Curated annotation (Swiss-Prot):
3-methyl-2-oxobutanoate binds at residues 51-52, 90, 120. It comes from Caulobacter vibrioides (strain NA1000 / CB15N). This is 3-methyl-2-oxobutanoate hydroxymethyltransferase. Catalyzes the reversible reaction in which hydroxymethyl group from 5,10-methylenetetrahydrofolate is transferred onto alpha-ketoisovalerate to form ketopantoate. It catalyses: 3-methyl-2-oxobutanoate + (6R)-5,10-methylene-5,6,7,8-tetrahydrofolate + H2O = 2-dehydropantoate + (6S)-5,6,7,8-tetrahydrofolate. Its main location: cytoplasm. It is found in: Cytoplasm. InterPro entries: Pantoate_hydroxy_MeTrfase, Pyrv/PenolPyrv_kinase-like_dom, Pyrv_kinase-like_dom_sf. Keywords: Cytoplasm, Magnesium, Metal-binding, Pantothenate biosynthesis, Transferase.
Length: 275
């Protein structure tokens, strides 16, 4: 027997995240590629393969055009790059709304082909029933209430939710139904602090906020926003780096070195051995 054993790292799963209700805040970031997933893995509890990949990686105007194939491809990459964090894959628009059976088939396909630990679905009138159908059949589901990016065409843009009494009641009801249906956690997006706290206090599962204040049980951001890869930064984002600026500076220096023939230099050049 070998004297050296490879250390096994246990990946977090739905019960671990569910148990964090009211405890140390859950750390979540989006990830779409293996190298970024590897870099985020130690710091994060959850890596969300969000359908935001359509906008931040593929340049789409919204998430409506994201496909199952795209989500599976990026889910596979994130699973390969990470070891510890729970990986949750968004179910794209049109993959879970038509029927419970279709939602189940697509959720199972995502989990089998990626190896992810759960899927995420956005709220809607029939979605709690779908969540219940999936969880009864062994599929861990993360919910999503408040601002729904997949409904951007229906609602005329990315608009904060719960601004009046009726809106607040709707978000609270969606959260209640989502939790009761069996979701192990709920993303709360684009709502006022008071509503985020009320949602968090009203459900028995952890809430993970994005644009929803520190009143949630955890936080998620799009990693490209957090790293400063875009010129525009949403109000709810704190930029922890300026990678766009770093990339531009590195590319400019590389271009200069190529044009003045200082790259490649002796250190980057292969030479034939002298006889």
């Amino acid at each position: 027997m070998s004297a050296h054993r490879e250390e096994t790292v246990r990946r977090l799963a739905a019960p671990d995240i569910a148990a964090r209700k009211g405890g140390v805040p859950i750390v979540c970031l989006t990830a779409y590629t293996a190298p970024v997933a590897a870099a985020l893995d130690d710091a994060c509890d959850v890596l969300l393969v969000g359908d935001s990949v359509g906008m931040v990686v593929h340049g789409l105007p919204n998430t409506v055009g994201v496909t199952m194939e795209m989500m599976i491809l990026h889910g596979q990459a994130v699973m390969r790059g990470s070891k510890k964090a729970m990986v949750v894959v968004d179910m794209p628009f049109g993959s879970y709304e038509a029927s419970h059976e279709e939602a189940y088939a697509n959720a199972v396909r995502i989990m089998k082909e990626t190896g992810a630990q759960a899927v995420k679905v956005e709220s809607g009138p029939t979605v709690p029933e779908t969540i219940a159908y999936l969880t009864r059949r062994g599929v861990p589901v993360m919910g999503h209430v408040g601002l729904r990016p997949q409904a951007v065409l229906l609602e005329g843009g990315f608009k904060a939710k719960g601004k009046d009494d009726a809106g607040r009641a709707k978000v609270l009801e969606e959260a209640r139904l989502t939790a009761e249906a069996g979701a192990f956690a709920i993303v709360v997006e684009g709502v006022a602090e008071s509503l985020a706290r009320e949602v968090t206090e009203s459900v028995s599962v952890p809430t993970i906020g994005i644009g929803a204040s520190a009143g949630c049980d955890g936080q998620v951001l799009v990693v490209d926003d957090m790293l400063g890869l875009f010129d525009w930064t949403p109000k709810f984002v704190r930029r922890y780096a300026d990678l766009k600026g770093e990339i531009e500076r590195a590319a400019a220096q590389y271009a200069s070195d190529v044009r003045d023939r200082s790259f490649p230099g002796p250190a980057e050049t292969y030479y034939a051995k002298k006889p």
